[in-house]
């Protein structure tokens, strides 16, 4: 009888221990889940803040250039300003034409007045003039052409003959140029390649927090 009582006490003690361990585990799991949720909420707030700024800039650019006769396109997703290369250059040339300079003298002041206004300028990391070509010719030739064309736009903007405009000096802290050869083509709605639209120049902007937010978005998606 005494042995049976001892065994009963033993199993009761073991059961109590297991119950206590399960309670501790459940408590720790709850804490981890709550911390995870708070972390996700904070990350989402950061993503939303950057997304809101980007959307505000895109909306302002769209409003500024809608209905204009400049023949430009505002990408609703990225905010990239896109216009055909033949507006600025003659075929095969990287030198900005007379008509191209006239176009830039109208476009550039309007663009910088949006991008570098007080409520946006502290959020901007860089502004990139980016050149693109079609697939005609070898990669290196087109890379050189696209880079030269993008650089020539920046060169014209800061040349002595270019008209003064607000934010001109400030823009030097942001503006750079880049060429992508034929690596980022434009396709038609049916997915077919559009050589004419692929020959283009784009004005892009990057936000200071954008790269970090992209990393956060990857983590959120993976988790």
Residue ranges of each PLM-predicted region?
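Short terminal targeting/anchoring segments
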Residues: 1-63, 67, 76
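Second-shell loop/turn segments in exported
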Residues: 47, 87-101, 138-144
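Extracytoplasmic/secreted envelope proteins and their assembly/folding machinery
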Residues: 54, 58, 62, 101, ...
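Soluble periplasmic/extracytoplasmic beta-strand elements of cell-envelope proteins
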Residues: 71-73, 80-88, 126-130, 176-178, ...
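Periplasmic OmpA-like peptidoglycan-binding domain that tethers envelope proteins to the cell wall
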Residues: 98, 130-210
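Short, cationic low-complexity segments
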Residues: 218-223
């Amino acid at each position: 009888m005494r042995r049976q009582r001892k065994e009963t006490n033993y199993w009761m003690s073991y059961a109590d221990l297991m119950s206590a361990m399960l309670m501790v585990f459940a408590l720790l799991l709850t804490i981890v889940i709550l911390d995870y949720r708070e972390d996700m909420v904070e990350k989402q707030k950061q993503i939303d803040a950057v997304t809101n700024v980007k959307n505000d800039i895109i909306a302002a650019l769209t409003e500024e250039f809608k209905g204009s006769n400049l023949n430009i396109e505002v990408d609703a997703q990225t905010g990239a300003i896109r216009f055909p290369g033949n507006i600025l250059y003659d075929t095969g040339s990287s030198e900005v034409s007379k008509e191209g300079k006239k176009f830039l003298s109208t476009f550039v002041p309007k663009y910088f007045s949006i991008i570098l206004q007080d409520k946006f300028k502290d959020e901007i990391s860089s502004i990139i003039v980016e050149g693109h070509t079609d697939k005609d010719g070898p990669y290196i030739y087109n890379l050189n052409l696209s880079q030269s064309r993008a650089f020539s736009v920046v060169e014209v903007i800061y040349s002595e003959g270019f008209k003064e405009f607000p934010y001109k000096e400030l823009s030097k802290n942001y503006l750079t140029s880049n060429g992508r050869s034929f690596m980022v083509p434009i396709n038609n709605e049916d997915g077919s390649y559009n050589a004419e639209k692929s020959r283009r120049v784009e004005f892009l902007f990057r936000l200071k927090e954008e790269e970090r937010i992209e990393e956060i978005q990857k983590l959120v998606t993976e988790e």
